């Protein structure tokens, strides 16, 4: 295939450094992610290489020009997310920026990948949503941001955040301290996320009034959760019985989000409640399953590589096991 060449010009009035990033960081990140050569001199940007990739780069810079015109500067981390959106057939990557879930103390929480955007859209349009994927994909954080936003808009009367408390083979009865002290370490990730989104004093006040509840999954038994946004975290550590119990707590004007990662199961020798739930509920109306992938990991670039390395290790181990079985 014959190489393609184009020349782009940074629009008048836009500082090229806003487009290319500090120290040309955006430019370097871009070249590492596309099959094209990109050279910037002054206000000119020359792009050459695979025709499809050249077109992709042109669309990327159209997005970068719009961001710069609005006073925003892309970071090197933004490049891979933007390219992923454009490669997926979207014509404009700004849909992620425009979808603000929550603003707190000048910090904006929004989906950062197309997978996250689809997950958020699924939560908005379904009563029950399962968010499945590896660590760092924002499953719980985005769900909690939507929950807090719903509470602030008075769409629901309370938030309920829950997770199984028996993990890593530990039995709470054998741990020292009061029940609250035993439970607190398991709930801490939920507290941390909540304090990222709301004033701590206000959060404490709402918790005292029962408007926000953070409790172990076992505390959901026998209840009907109405007028509530409920998030069940670490669902891979539920049993099938616990999962059924939780799902049947649904009341009127409520929304349930269940998050989990099947690669991080702590249940030993037992089947978890997340393993078969898509086969059971996959065709039930108003229930959505959103699968987040490694491309949706946004914590730190290294987290994505760690997840990828573990997946490769697990795949290789499974292949060796199959080979041994076939050789017998």
Roles of regions detected by a PLM:
Residues 44, 104-116, 120-232, 236-328:
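Conserved helicase motor core of SF1/SF2 NTP-dependent helicases
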Residues 19, 57-60, 243-246:
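Hydrophobic side chains in well-ordered alpha-helices
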Residues 32-39:
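A short, structured beta-strand/loop element
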Residues 83-99, 315-328:
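Intrinsically disordered, low-complexity linkers and terminal tails enriched in Pro/Gly
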Residues 39-96:
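Interdomain "pre-motor" coupling segment immediately N-terminal to P-loop NTPase/helicase cores
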Residues 1-17:
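Short glycine-/aliphatic-rich beta-strand segments at the starts of folded cytosolic domains
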Residues 15-32:
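Short amphipathic alpha-helix segments
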Residues 13, 51-52, 237, 297:
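Short, surface-exposed acidic/glycine-rich loop or hinge patches that mediate macromolecular interfaces
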């Amino acid at each position: 295939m014959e190489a393609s060449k184009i020349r782009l010009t940074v629009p008048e009035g836009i500082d090229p450094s806003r487009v290319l990033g500090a120290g040309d960081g955006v430019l370097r990140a871009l070249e590492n992610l596309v099959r094209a050569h990109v050279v910037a001199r002054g206000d000119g940007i020359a792009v050459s290489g695979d025709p499809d990739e050249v077109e992709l780069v042109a669309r990327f810079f159209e997005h970068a020009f719009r961001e710069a015109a609005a006073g925003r500067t892309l970071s090197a981390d933004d490049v891979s997310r933007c390219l992923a959106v454009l490669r997926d057939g979207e014509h404009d990557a700004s849909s992620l920026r425009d979808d603000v879930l929550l603003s707190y103390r000048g910090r904006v929480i929004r989906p950062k990948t197309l997978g996250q955007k689809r997950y958020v859209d699924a939560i908005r349009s379904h009563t029950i949503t399962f968010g499945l994927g590896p660590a760092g994909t924002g499953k719980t954080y985005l769900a909690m941001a939507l929950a807090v936003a719903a509470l602030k808009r008075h769409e629901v009367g309370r938030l309920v955040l829950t997770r199984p408390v028996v993990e890593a083979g530990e039995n709470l009865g054998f741990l020292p301290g009061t029940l609250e002290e035993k439970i607190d370490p398991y709930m801490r990730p939920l507290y941390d996320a909540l304090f990222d989104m709301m004033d701590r004093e206000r959060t404490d006040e709402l918790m005292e009034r029962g408007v926000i509840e953070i409790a172990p999954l076992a505390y959901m038994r026998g209840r009907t959760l109405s007028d509530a946004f409920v998030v069940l975290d670490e669902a891979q550590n539920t049993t099938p019985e616990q999962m059924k119990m939780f799902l049947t707590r649904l009341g009127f004007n409520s929304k349930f989000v269940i998050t989990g990662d099947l690669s991080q199961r702590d249940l030993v020798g037992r089947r978890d409640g997340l393993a078969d739930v898509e086969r059971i509920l996959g065709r039930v109306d108003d229930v959505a399953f959103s699968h987040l992938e490694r491309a949706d990991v946004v914590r730190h670039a290294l987290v994505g590589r760690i997840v990828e390395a573990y997946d490769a290790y697990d795949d290789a181990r499974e292949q060796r096991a199959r080979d041994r079985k076939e050789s017998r």
